[in-house]
Amino acid sequence: MAKKQRNEIDWTDEEEEIIWVSKSEIKRDAEHLKKLGASLIELNSANLAKMPIDDTLREAIELAQRLRLEARRRQIQYIGKLLRNVDHEPIQEALDKVENRHNQQQALLHKLELIRDELIEQGDSAINPLVDEYPTLDRQHLRNLIRAAQKEKQANKPPKNYREIFQYLKSTIIEQN
């Protein structure tokens, strides 16, 4: 019987499950980790402190934030390499939470703009449901702002009260949330 070489794989062994990973898949994973590293570099120090990363990775990210151009690119490569050695899923989840908080704030501001436009178009009929939903709103102050914004719109004046309605809604509703 021929002697089995040390590096040769025994294809008859059924107990061992061999998972083949293509070179392209390895490259895609490495590219994904580099993008994750680049996203971490863009975070400010407060958000970076919330990330579940070790000290070596944190120092590499802080160094990359100070570097420019080619040195930064090489540092991102290095951060990607460090990310290959750690479980990157908790880091990705924490990053998604930080980015999603920004998206939630943008959605809230967009909602406030729609509420403001609806208030100006419909007047008093739109105030009651809004005050029911947000009881901290001052109904009389809101009516005065809406009336002034409607007059500005008819007279083609600059939208001072239009912006003031938005600021009032923003300060009151965000404070309540």
Swiss-Prot record:
Gene3D superfamilies the record matches: PSPTO4464-like domains
Q: Which GO terms describe its cellular component?
A: cytosol
Q: Which compartments is it annotated to reside in? A: Cytoplasm
InterPro entries registered for this protein in UniProt: DarP, DarP_sf
Please indicate if the UniProt record lists Transcription regulation as a keyword: no
Q: Does the keyword RNA-binding apply?
A: yes
Gene Ontology molecular-function annotations: ribosome binding; rRNA binding
Cite the entry's keywords alphabetically. Cytoplasm, Ribosome biogenesis, RNA-binding, rRNA-binding
One GO biological process this protein is involved in is: assembly of large subunit precursor of preribosome
Per the entry, what this protein does is: Member of a network of 50S ribosomal subunit biogenesis factors which assembles along the 30S-50S interface, preventing incorrect 23S rRNA structures from forming. Promotes peptidyl transferase center (PTC) maturation.
Family designation? Belongs to the DarP family.
> What is the protein's given name?
Dual-action ribosomal maturation protein DarP
Q: Which gene encodes it?
A: darP
